[in-house]
Every structure is written in structure tokens, then in C-alpha cells.
Regions:
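Short alpha-helical patches at coil-to-helix transitions and adjacent helical residues
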Residues: 44-47, 81, 85, 124-132
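A short glycine/serine-rich beta->alpha loop
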Residues: 33-40, 117-120
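Short, structured coil/loop segments at alpha-helix boundaries
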Residues: 33, 62-72, 84, 145-157
Length: 272
């Protein structure tokens, strides 16, 4: 963890925020702040649901391997690209409910993620460290790199790269403005936003992959306690930008201007 990690700006009290960021390639750079703190997952849990379904389909959870059905593909697209909750309800059941999602988590290395036992998947809890571990598994990196089959990893990433424009905020704010080809959405993302009934305060979280300084990065930013949705989105985006900037040499440099870029190949590029 770089020495300036503790000085990353925090959210407006009473909000909390945690983050974990790392290059996609197995490199030593990383940054974490409160990465083991527990947060309500909201719709970032939808990536976990899809990964759990994929494991079930590929036969990794003691079930016979089979093909993904056309209905499951349609639900998955709606759940990730548009954050459709009805589709998430259906896939939660298809993935085996809380028991199936929990079993998948053991394989994926998300030890501190707790699936809600009553079917209210958005109230499952997780940590930024677990979300980073899940992203690494989805991208075929780290000790769980072979848990998901190649087709499953590609499926999850493809859908996270197709999230509708109105939901492409969050960690994508850390991407270089010209890191991707013209007209191509920036990176892969899934966001969560949820006002808590008891307090009216917002859970705002974002996970995904972006390209910055010529390198792909995996980021997870979880937060809660925001008085407005807009305040939470701004805090998450600021934290994502500052975390990646602290890990690169691009501070103050606009990638649209001529000049040398950092080494490493850029890789290809989702609420309630």
C-alpha cells in the first residue's frame, strides 16, 4: 500500500468509504483503504450472482454441467446491463439462492461476503477486498484464476462492458478519457445504489475495470451513509480517481496531449 493511501480524501460524514485497487497484471502496486470493512452490497451483488450461476452451469458446485439457457442469458443481460431487479431475483434462484451463492463465494475467494438468507440479495454484505478478489477471478488472475471457465469469464466481462450509459458512473471516472477507442464505452463496471429504509441514507458502490496510464486496473469502491445519491456518486468517483492516480505517473497529465505513456498493454474494456 503506498504511503499516501491514508491521505486519500474521505466522504462527507456520516458516510463511510472503502476501496481496493490493483493492476490487472500480477504487479506489486496496490492501494487499499478500509478494504475489510463490511458494507451492504446493493446491486454490485449482481456480479456475484452471475458468477454463481456460471459456476453452477459449468458443474463446479456438484451439479451436472449444462448449457446456459436462452432465458438465463436474457435475464443476465437485463441484470447487469440495466440492473434489472426482477432478473436478479430469477437468477438468484437459478444460482441456488443464498446457499448456492455462498458455495460459489467459497470457490471465488470472497470469504467475508454474506449472502442474505431471505432472498433479499441486495442486503447481502461484502467488502472491497472481496470485490477485488471476485474481479480478479472474473479476469482470470490470482489464485482463483481458473475457477470460472473461460466462457464464463468472457460472459461476465462482456455484460459489464455493455452497461447502459446512465449507469456508467463510478470507478469509470478513473479511466483516461482517451484510453478506449472512440465511441467505445469506458471499461467494465457494475454499480449499486440503495437508500436505506431506516435512515434514508444512501449506499453507493462501484466495481470494475478501467484503463489508465496505458494499463488496465481493477477497482472496488464501497460506501454508505450519504445524504443524497449524488453526494455518494461524487465520493466514489473521487476515491477511484485518486486511488489510480496515486498508483500511476499520470498526475496532472492529460492523456490527450502528446507525450510518453507508461508501459504495459491496455486491455479491452454496470444499482438498484
Amino acid at each position: 500500500v503506498p504511503p499516501d493511501a491514508a491521505r486519500l480524501p474521505g466522504p462527507v460524514p456520516p458516510a463511510r468509504l472503502s476501496l481496493a485497487a490493483q493492476p490487472l497484471e500480477d504487479a506489486p502496486e496496490s492501494v487499499a483503504r478500509g478494504a475489510d470493512e463490511v458494507f451492504v452490497a446493493a446491486s454490485v451483488m449482481k456480479v456475484h450472482i452471475l458468477a454463481a450461476l456460471a459456476l453452477r452451469v459449468q458443474g463446479a458446485l456438484g451439479h451436472r454441467a449444462r448449457e446456459v439457457t436462452a432465458q438465463e442469458r436474457a435475464w443476465a443481460a437485463a441484470m447487469i446491463e440495466r440492473s434489472d431487479n426482477a432478473a436478479a431475483n430469477a437468477l438468484w434462484q437459478a444460482a441456488g439462492g443464498a446457499a448456492g451463492v455462498t458455495a460459489a463465494g467459497r470457490l471465488l475467494g470472497t470469504a467475508r461476503t454474506r449472502a442474505a438468507p431471505d432472498g433479499r440479495w441486495g442486503l447481502s454484505t461484502t467488502t472491497a477486498a472481496d470485490q477485488l478478489a471476485l474481479l480478479r477471478a472474473v479476469h482470470g488472475r490470482g489464485p482463483r484464476r481458473e475457477v470460472l471457465a473461460p466462457w464464463a469469464r468472457q460472459w461476465v466481462r462482456h455484460l459489464m462492458g455493455r452497461v447502459v450509459p446512465g449507469q456508467r458512473w463510478g470507478v469509470t471516472a478513473a479511466a483516461d478519457p482517451c484510453a478506449e477507442a472512440p465511441g467505445v464505452p469506458q471499461g467494465e463496471v457494475k454499480n449499486g445504489w440503495l437508500p436505506r429504509t431506516a435512515t434514508g441514507l444512501w449506499v453507493i458502490s462501484s466495481v470494475g475495470r478501467v484503463t489508465a496510464a496505458g494499463r488496465p486496473w481493477l477497482l472496488a469502491v464501497l460506501s454508505d451513509g450519504h445524504t443524497t445519491r449524488q453526494e455518494g456518486v461524487a465520493a466514489v468517483e473521487r476515491a477511484a480517481r485518486d486511488a489510480v492516480r496515486g498508483l500511476t505517473d499520470r498526475a496532472g497529465r492529460d492523456c490527450r496531449q502528446p507525450g510518453p505513456r507508461s508501459g504495459g498493454a491496455a486491455g479491452p474494456a454496470a444499482g438498484e
